[in-house]
């Protein structure tokens, strides 16, 4: 199956609530690679690469996030795949 990479930008109460940790855990659980990092404006940027059905499942999870977060908006776009090791928290 082809590998797809997507960039997600998650807005809401997503910093200081363990969002990146839970996102990394969920990504690894779905056999995805990539990263989650805080942005200066309070959003979280997530890059995820893997099988398309797993990316879709991950996107559905990101729409809700962990119980400690409040996701107001999720933007996504397909990007060129790069080599990532694991699912990092940056």
UniProtKB/Swiss-Prot annotation:
Source species: Vibrio vulnificus (strain YJ016)
GO MF entry, a single one: acylphosphatase activity
Protein name, UniProt field: Acylphosphatase
Positions of the catalytic residues: 20, 38
Keyword vocabulary terms for this entry: Hydrolase
Top-level lineage group: Bacteria
Acylphosphatase-like domain boundaries: 5-90
Family matches, as Pfam families: Acylphosphatase
Gene3D superfamilies named among the record's database cross-references: 3.30.70.100
Broad class of enzyme this protein falls into: hydrolase
High-level lineage: Bacteria, Pseudomonadati, Pseudomonadota, Gammaproteobacteria, Vibrionales
E.C. numbers: 3.6.1.7
Gene name of the encoded protein: acyP
PROSITE patterns registered for this protein in UniProt: ACYLPHOSPHATASE_1, ACYLPHOSPHATASE_2, ACYLPHOSPHATASE_3
UniProt similarity note: Belongs to the acylphosphatase family.
PANTHER family, sorted: ACYLPHOSPHATASE (PTHR47268:SF4)
Reaction equation(s) it catalyzes: an acyl phosphate + H2O = a carboxylate + phosphate + H(+)
UniProt xrefs under NCBIfam families: PRK14426.1
